[in-house]
Amino acid sequence: MSNMQQTTGYVYANELLQYRFSNKHPFNQMRLKLTTELLMELGQLKQHHIISPRIATDDELSLIHAYDYIQAIRHASHGILSENEAKKYGLDGEDTLQFRMMHKHSARIVGGALNLADQIMSGTLTNGCHLGGGLHHSLPGRANGFCIYNDVAITISYLMQKYNQRVLCIDTDAHHGDGTQWSFYTNDQALIYSIHETGKFLFPGSGHYTERGAEKGFGYTVNIPLEPYTEDQSFLDVFKQTIEPVVASFKPDIIVSVHGVDVHYLDPLTHMSCTLNTLYEIPYIVKSLADTYTQGKVIMFGGGGYNIWKVVPRAWSHVFLALIGEQPPTGSLPERWLTKWQPYATCTLPTNWSDDKENYIEIPRRKEISEINMKQAQKVLSWFE
């Protein structure tokens, strides 16, 4: 399929920035605005790409979430959720806090994904991204890991039920996408593939390779847990070697992918040692798989990524650039973007597209880590021989 035939959507509205737990919370949607403006200054993101989100309906939310949970989020939006209910629904800790109008702002993220899905399925668009989404930890009846409504899981269910699609989810966030996995654990119409930092040391503690699905869904969950301090070469080797046979075996109609960028060595919440090289390459790999197996149909979500100044805007820009068929840029970042945002930044902004390897430490256990990771890959590959 030539680039001229492809049309790409980019979900954005300033209202998406209102999904905010507190001013000090690490989940900061300002990263979405930074990425959007970087792409615009680059001259690649145009107004015709923009897909406006909407507020998802309760029926749409209930494709995954329990009715009582949705009502609890509504109550929390107005500050009338009891202490016992807050504990029951996962809203009593410091990770996933209650905030005003949280139902509306969370449902808007879901609605953006569904608008994009409809336009792809109608043929108006070939592909698209929703970098403000990717809330893959939320469980059917419980908030979890900064996530209220699981827009990834809802989109998968929506594509399955409304359009009868076989959906492959590729999740490369450093944290295992537990909410998405458990939502489809007994289903054989969705395959959930996740490559992530091992749950031995990182939230949510799940994603072991033995978690393969259950009942008719057995074999439709694929987990690749990686060792802490995994670097570019090992990550990409394992990813490339395992994802192709998974896709070829499952034969999806559409791909949904989660592009958390928290495997970067500067991310404050994880223990991985990848650079921008890995984060730049991943969306191009996923795009190539979509072109080969799904006539180009793919929805790319954001996800984790908590160094919002030095990592996320540059990394997420490549999600959109991959979708429109542009090669990764080189050289300096747009001067206007740097000039606008440096006064607000909590650090000195990077001035070019490449990592300067600031504070990067060569990992002494590189060989050992790579061997452990490849053993995990071999176990998974044996299932698809």
UniProtKB/Swiss-Prot annotation:
Any one GO biological process: epigenetic regulation of gene expression
Reported function: Role in growth on acetoin or butanediol. Involved in the breakdown of these compounds used as a carbon source.
Family classification: Belongs to the histone deacetylase family.
Protein name listed in UniProt: Acetoin utilization protein AcuC
Residues passing through the membrane, by range: none
Lineage: Bacteria, Bacillati, Bacillota, Bacilli, Bacillales
Domain of life: Bacteria
InterPro entries (alphabetical): AcuC, HDAC_PDAC, His_deacetylse, His_deacetylse_dom, His_deacetylse_dom_sf, Ureohydrolase_dom_sf
GO molecular function: histone deacetylase activity
Alphabetized UniProt keyword annotations: Acetoin catabolism
Pfam families tied to this protein: Hist_deacetyl
Pathway: Ketone degradation; acetoin degradation
Annotated source species: Staphylococcus xylosus
